[in-house]
Design a protein with these regions (language model features):
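Terminal output helix/cap of sensory domains in signal transduction proteins
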Residues: 12-13, 62-91
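Conserved hydrophobic beta-strand signature of PAS-family and PAS-like sensory domains
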Residues: 25, 33-35
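N-terminal capping loop/helix in small sensory signaling domains highlighted by a polar->aromatic N-x2-3-F motif
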Residues: 37-41
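PAS-family sensory/regulatory domains
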Residues: 52-65
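Sensory coupling linkers of modular signal transduction proteins
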Residues: 106-139
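Basic, amphipathic alpha-helical hairpins
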Residues: 140-153, 172, 193-202, 222, ...
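Basic/polar phosphate-binding segments, predominantly the helix-turn-helix DNA-binding elements
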Residues: 155-184, 209-229
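Terminal helix-turn-helix DNA-binding modules in bacterial transcription factors
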Residues: 175-213, 236-239
Length: 239
């Protein structure tokens, strides 16, 4: 029977992945159970400890249709077809999502036997999203990302899409099951979560950069969406 990979990846490699807040990384065994994930992965699923993931599979963490998609990718890798730089929409625990590039490769033991899979997915920047014709409403999402800290009107977003405000509403509902405003609010919250953990910015600075009216609005909205205050969230992941 093949010897499984060590649960802990090399320290330097793990440290590198921990300082890349826009990259989720993981290692799984041949059955699809997680052996290791980085902090960005935990944050994406609203978790705080590695022990909450180790031994679990995608079906334990994601809706059935997403889990089936992830598992199909793993099986492709195990069958000798690595996933390289694939464009996909990656969901979060709050039912929002962002566009990413995903790579999955085989994991091998010291004898070269395939014992599982490793992978990472990187969140795309505004420039990347805006340049990809295959991303639905990419120009609008890129505008949202660039204008995250300021005000952006429905008319401006509609012009970026080359349609009317009503047409934009219908397009977002069709492609993302959200209104443009709902998508923008969740995008702001995702970015705030990332900045709370990956930067030393004050709560007021994070609130300003992510487009919240002031820190009190930030605190209220953040607690409503995550169940905790921004300060508690930072302590949860950073300590």
């Amino acid at each position: 029977m093949p010897k499984p990979p060590k649960q802990n990846t090399p320290l330097a490699f793990r440290e590198l992945l921990e300082v890349m807040p826009d990259v989720q990384a993981w290692m799984k065994d041949r059955e699809g159970s997680y052996l290791w994930v980085n902090t960005a992965f935990l944050m994406n699923y609203g978790l705080t400890r590695l022990s909450q993931v180790v031994g679990k599979a995608d079906r334990d963490l994601s809706p059935a249709h997403l889990a089936a998609h992830f598992e199909a990718g793993d099986q492709a890798v195990l069958s000798g077809r690595p996933v390289n730089h694939r464009l996909e929409l990656v969901g979060r625990y709050d039912h929002s999502a962002h566009w990413c590039r995903t790579t999955k490769l085989p994991a091998r033991d010291e004898r070269g036997t395939m014992v599982g899979t490793v992978g990472f997915t990187r969140r795309l920047t505004a420039a990347e999203v805006g340049q990809m014709a295959e991303i639905p409403l990419g120009a609008v999402i890129a505008t949202m990302i660039r204008r995250l800290g300021g005000k952006v009107t429905s008319g401006e977003l509609a012009r970026a899409a080359g349609t009317s405000v009503r047409g934009l509403e219908r397009a977002f509902d069709r492609d993302y099951c959200l209104s443009p405003r709902q998508y923008l609010r969740r995008l702001r919250m995702q970015t705030a979560c990332q900045q709370l953990v990956s930067t030393r910015s004050t709560l007021a600075q994070v609130a300003d950069r992510c487009g919240f009216a002031d820190q009190s609005h930030f605190n209220r909205d953040f607690k409503r969406m995550t169940g905790m205050t921004p300060r508690a969230y930072r302590l949860k992941f950073v300590g």
